[in-house]
Structure formats: structure tokens, C-alpha cells
């Protein structure tokens, strides 16, 4: 019987499952190397942790690792129901809150090694977390994609730690009771982007679609479709970072000015940015809550030991 120790949290409604122990040791000098080792040689552990019968499509996993840089608190590898994620904003906030719950870190600044580079997070005395994300930028403005059943859809392509297609004009109500229509539109758009060869830099696949609408209590409300056809319950940290990059590129948000981003559930992140050459450095503040501590058991006699 194999055992995997976990602690679960949610950030603005979006869950994170932090794996503390039980996964195989991963070789590699960088977090990208370790992610590749997990993906290529031990992917069944991701499936066992996140897929049914132990998990669900909406779960995001975070594997706690020893850091690869001397001044980092830890390393982390993010993954979901279909594969691996370079960076995860809500997951980093959940990671920090979970480590604090376990007594492993105190309020203050902490560096985290990720597969796309180091990020910094500040745990505040009130329990909120400010993430200093990887540099973000808009790659392409007003790209057009033909989406079957919806016609021409216009959006910006931006990097915020993952690749996003950001759509302001879509004709849909961005409300929780309209998730089915939002999901169908977003998935169709994501598929059309791939089929028509519309990508991020260096041919990178755009694996997130972000839709926007007005919100009475925030600067904007979004709906984010993630890889694996699961929508983000939070305002999405990397998605908010991509939005900040587009706002900065359009001259609509000044350096240091706050942007309040609401998600589909009504939860909110507060963001701002600093300029770094051709990029911006996003800062995202949110809060996570611990929901469970558990030991997952993997019985190799179980036909669904490694997920369904």
C-alpha cells in the first residue's frame, strides 16, 4: 500500500492539492528538469492524486519539492487533470497558506522555485498573500480566430505564467448560472486556436481562454477556461497577470495602480504591476483557506489505483 500525504486548500474557490510526501524522488538540476522527470517517468502519480476516484477535474495539484536555488523556501511543480502547468497563481497562494498552516513558514517574504522561474510571495500578518509573479507581456493584440458557430472572435494573446487568449467582446453573460454556455464557447475557441495554428511565442500552445465583463464591485469580472476543460473558480492569478500586461500595453493602467479582478464566483484578486523593460512584473494579492489534511492510499490491487 503506497501513501501520499496531502493538504488541500482553496483560493477564491479554486482548489489546490499540495503533495507533501509520497511521490518518487525526481532527478534534475532545475525545476523544469524535475517537472519533465515527473511527466516522462512518473506521471501515474499525478493521475492517482488528481483523477477520480480520489480527485476531480477541477483540482490543481502542487508537488512540494526541495528548492534548486539556495535562497528559496521550496520548489513546486503544478499539474492538473490533463498534464502540467508552468505556473499557477492561485496554487502559489494556496501553497504559501498551506506551508504556514503546517508551521513551515512565518509571515514575510518567501522565494519559490517553479519550472518557469522563481517567484516571490509575501505572507501578510492577516493571512493574505501577495504573489510577485514571473514577468508578463502581451504577445499579440487583437488576434482573430474563426470559431464554428460563433464567427470571428477577437482577442489578445498574452503570457502571465501560462498562455492566454483574452476576449472582451463575446456576447455572453459572465455569471455562474451561465457556466455551460461560457464553457462551450471557451472550449470551442481554444480548439479553433489550435486548429488554425494561432499560438503564443515560439509556437507555444494557448491553453487558457479568458472572457471579461463588467462587475459592479470590481474593475472587471472574468471567466477562465483552463486546460482539461475545467473552469477556474478564482479570478486566476496568471490570467490576472496576463490582463495586467494587456492593460499596461494599451496604456489603460498606470504602473503601481491597483486593478481589482473578480472571478466567476465573485471572489477577487487585487493586482498591480511594475515595468521591467519590455515586460511587466505582476503583483497579485489573494487569500487561501485550508480545507483538509489527508493521506491518500494507493492499493495496486485496486483497478483504479492510478486514476480513471
From Swiss-Prot:
Residues of the active site are 88 (proton acceptor), 236 (proton donor)
Which Gene Ontology molecular-function terms are recorded? 4-hydroxyproline epimerase activity
Write down the superkingdom of origin. Answer: Bacteria
**Protein name, per record:** 4-hydroxyproline 2-epimerase
Role this protein plays: Catalyzes the epimerization of trans-4-hydroxy-L-proline (t4LHyp) to cis-4-hydroxy-D-proline (c4DHyp). Is likely involved in a degradation pathway that converts t4LHyp to alpha-ketoglutarate. Can also catalyze the epimerization of trans-3-hydroxy-L-proline (t3LHyp) to cis-3-hydroxy-D-proline (c3DHyp), albeit with 19-fold lower efficiency. Displays no proline racemase activity.
EC assignment: the record states 5.1.1.8
Q: Do you know which NCBIfam families this protein is assigned to?
A: PRK13970.1
Q: In the UniProt record, does the keyword Membrane occur?
A: no
Does the record bear Transferase in its keywords?
A: no
Q: Which UniProt keywords apply?
A: Isomerase
Organism from which the protein derives: Chromobacterium violaceum (strain ATCC 12472 / DSM 30191 / JCM 1249 / CCUG 213 / NBRC 12614 / NCIMB 9131 / NCTC 9757 / MK)
Query: Which Pfam family, any one, appears in the UniProt record?
Result: Pro_racemase
